[in-house]
Curated annotation (Swiss-Prot):
Domain of life: Archaea
GO cellular component: a single term: cytosolic large ribosomal subunit
Species classification: Archaea, Thermoproteota, Candidatus Korarchaeia, Candidatus Korarchaeales, Candidatus Korarchaeaceae
Record gene name: rpl14
Keywords of this entry: Ribonucleoprotein, Ribosomal protein, RNA-binding, rRNA-binding
Family (UniProt): Belongs to the universal ribosomal protein uL14 family.
Quaternary structure, from the entry: Part of the 50S ribosomal subunit. Forms a cluster with proteins L3 and L24e, part of which may contact the 16S rRNA in 2 intersubunit bridges.
Function of the molecule: Binds to 23S rRNA. Forms part of two intersubunit bridges in the 70S ribosome.
Entry protein name: Large ribosomal subunit protein uL14
Pfam family, any one: Ribosomal_L14
SUPFAM superfamilies per record: Ribosomal protein L14 (SSF50193)
Length: 141
C-alpha cells in the first residue's frame, strides 16, 4: 500500500498544531466519568528520537493516568483525547486559538467517549479528527 493510500485511511486529517503538552503534563478531565485530574504518560502515534520527550496537542490521542477522582479509576491507564490546550496555536485562516486550561476527555479504544457529557468548550480540531465527540459536545470553538 502506498503512502498516499495509507493517508486516506486515517479517520480525520490532523492539522499542524503547536505541541504544548509533554509527557507528565497534568490535564483537567472535561467529562463526567468521575476523573478530575489526568496525567499524560504516552502519546499515540508519536515517532520521536532518543531522549526526546513525546508531546501532544489538540486532537491527539494520549494515554493518561487518573491522579484525582473516583477511587476505581485511580492509577490505571486510559486513553484520552486532548480537547483544549493553553499554548496558542494558529488555524489555517490566520486566527490564533488559546484556551484557559489544558483538558482531555476519556475515550474507549475505538475513540468513542466514555462519559455522557462534556464540560467547557471543545476545540474544532478535535471534533474534526474524532467525529464521535461531536455528538456529546455542547460548545465547539
Amino acid at each position: 500500500m502506498s503512502k498516499v493510500a495509507r493517508r486516506r485511511k486515517v479517520e480525520g486529517v490532523k492539522p499542524k498544531i503547536t505541541h504544548g503538552l509533554p509527557v507528565r503534563a497534568r490535564l483537567k478531565c472535561a467529562d463526567n466519568t468521575g476523573a478530575k485530574l489526568l496525567m499524560i504518560i504516552g502519546v499515540h502515534g508519536y515517532k520521536g528520537r532518543k531522549d526526546r520527550v513525546p508531546t501532544a496537542s489538540v486532537g491527539d490521542m494520549v494515554t493518561v493516568v487518573v491522579k484525582r477522582g473516583k477511587y476505581d479509576l485511580m492509577h490505571k491507564p486510559f486513553k484520552a483525547i486532548v480537547v483544549r490546550q493553553r499554548m496558542p496555536y494558529r488555524r489555517k485562516n490566520g486566527q490564533w486559538v488559546v484556551f484557559e486550561d489544558n483538558a482531555a476527555v476519556l475515550v474507549n479504544d475505538d475513540g468513542t467517549p466514555r462519559g455522557s457529557e462534556f464540560r467547557g468548550p471543545i476545540a474544532k480540531e478535535a471534533i474534526e479528527r474524532w467525529p464521535s465527540l461531536s455528538v456529546i459536545s455542547a460548545q465547539v470553538v
